[in-house]
Amino acid sequence: TAIAHLESCRHRLNLTIKGDVLVHRVLFDGKRATGIQAESGGETFIIEGDEIILSAGAIASPQLLMLSGVGPDGNLGSVGITPVHTLEGVGQNLKNHPSLSLRFQPKAGYSLPPDSPRNQVVLRFAATGSSTRNDIQVQPLTSGPKGKEADEIRVGCRLELPESAGELTLTSADPSVQPKLDYQSLVQTQDRERMREAVRTCVRVFGHQGFDGIIEERISPSENDLASDASLDAWLDRNIGVAGHTCGTCKMGPASDPSSVVDQYCRVHG
């Protein structure tokens, strides 16, 4: 965004870019947004405008709406915020890619260098019975700081389009306190079945004799983990995480949809 849009216009007289600012809430006149209250360098101040654009991502956008009194009454009331406008869909429909790693011990000379590209896609396929093409993504991973990686090969499995959806809720009226993220990963049976297949497919692929000269042994999951659906489910639950694409918490849709938050022009309903 900075390279594509800001760099060429950052010197315009009618544009101010200010970093290190924490927005506390959106200000309203009735149900019309008129400005924001923010903090920077220990100073709290108000910025007003004819149009207030909230573009803070899938975590901070619903958080700011709720801190401003726009959201589900139950969650707002639980942290002492007086509702300005009840909108039950704010923070709902929280989604991300369920993601986990298989771990292998490499033979001498075949460790994955920590400065390798973060993601290197090696395999995409559709799980059995899936209506989504190529809904499983597999790639070798590096993630730690240079020189801090364990001497192992990690292979990431990612479910690209999950059915499961969770919610984001406030735990405090303090804008500096992170909200609670409950992704409900693999709650839907189809998601769990697809993830089981992804893991078993990776075990089979990386157990092929073509990798005998590279991989010494599989560290995780173990043979006991793979012995049954129940044992594999337990391993999934211990290891499941999410990838970097949180979305859905300010859903676009018609006002008649109680789970939607904005219309086709990204205007908040109500």
PLM regions: where:
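Non-transmembrane alpha-helical segments in soluble domains
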Residues: 6-7, 62-65, 73, 196-203
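Glycine-rich loop(s) and the adjacent beta-strand/alpha-helix scaffold that form part
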Residues: 25-26, 35-114, 173
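General small-molecule cofactor/ligand-binding pocket signal
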Residues: 16-18, 82-86, 139
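Conserved redox-cofactor binding core of oxidoreductases
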Residues: 1-41, 101-105, 113, 221-222, ...
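FAD-dependent oxidoreductase catalytic-site/capping-region signature
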Residues: 107-111, 118, 122-270
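Loop/turn elements at helix/coil->beta-strand transitions in domains of secreted/extracellular proteins
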Residues: 13-16, 49-50, 270
